[in-house]
Structures are given as structure tokens and as C-alpha cells.
Curated annotation (Swiss-Prot):
Family: Belongs to the UPF0381 family.
Regions crossing the membrane: none
Protein name (record): UPF0381 protein YfcZ
NCBIfam families membership: DUF406 family protein
Source organism superkingdom: Bacteria
InterPro entries assigned: DUF406, UPF0234-like_C
Disulfide-bond pairs as recorded: none
Gene: yfcZ
Organism listed in the record: Escherichia coli (strain K12)
GO cellular component: cytosol
Gene3D superfamilies xref list: 3.30.70.860
Length: 94
């Protein structure tokens, strides 16, 4: 059997994990509108705690609060040290 590449594999639906996870995308984004800022801040605190539980190096957390007609929009970017941490964080939210 020859060495496999991402383009050809001897088994259906099989490829090297490095082909999928190459650390090119280490940022997870979150966006939601809340009734008030207090609810948005509670969610930010909970998501920050989840991010801190999977980080190997400090995760850069960038929240933005925007007043809208129907409440407060919370947008957050979580930038992890590696893509695996970002995936673990996202899967933990499901």
C-alpha cells in the first residue's frame, strides 16, 4: 500500500487529521441579542469560564456590547492558542 495523501486514501472518508486541523482557524465567534446588558454580561462570564477551562495558553477574549432596538447585542471572539482548543470549546457549547 502506498503512502496516502489528502487527495487519495485507500479507505473511504479517511484522511490525516493534520489536513483538517492546521491551526489556521483558532478563533470561535459568538453573537446574540439579550433583553438587557446584565443578561449579556452573565453569558460573557459563563463563556469566559468555559474558554478558560480548555485553554493551554491564555485565550484572547474580545467582547463587544452594542445597544439595539430590541436589546443588547453581545459579540465575542475567542482566540485560542491552537485549533484543537477552539474545537473543544465549540463542542462543549453544544
Amino acid at each position: 500500500m502506498s503512502k496516502c495523501s489528502a487527495d487519495e486514501t485507500p479507505v473511504c472518508c479517511c484522511m490525516d487529521v493534520g489536513t483538517i486541523m492546521d491551526n489556521s482557524d483558532c478563533t470561535a465567534s459568538y453573537s446574540r441579542v439579550f433583553a438587557n446588558r446584565a443578561e449579556a454580561e452573565q453569558t460573557l462570564a459563563a463563556l469566559t469560564e468555559k474558554a478558560r477551562s480548555v485553554e493551554s495558553e491564555p485565550c484572547k477574549i474580545t467582547p463587544t456590547f452594542t445597544e439595539e432596538s430590541d436589546g443588547v447585542r453581545l459579540d465575542i471572539d475567542f482566540t485560542f492558542a491552537c485549533e484543537a482548543e477552539m474545537l473543544i470549546f465549540q463542542l462543549g457549547l453544544r
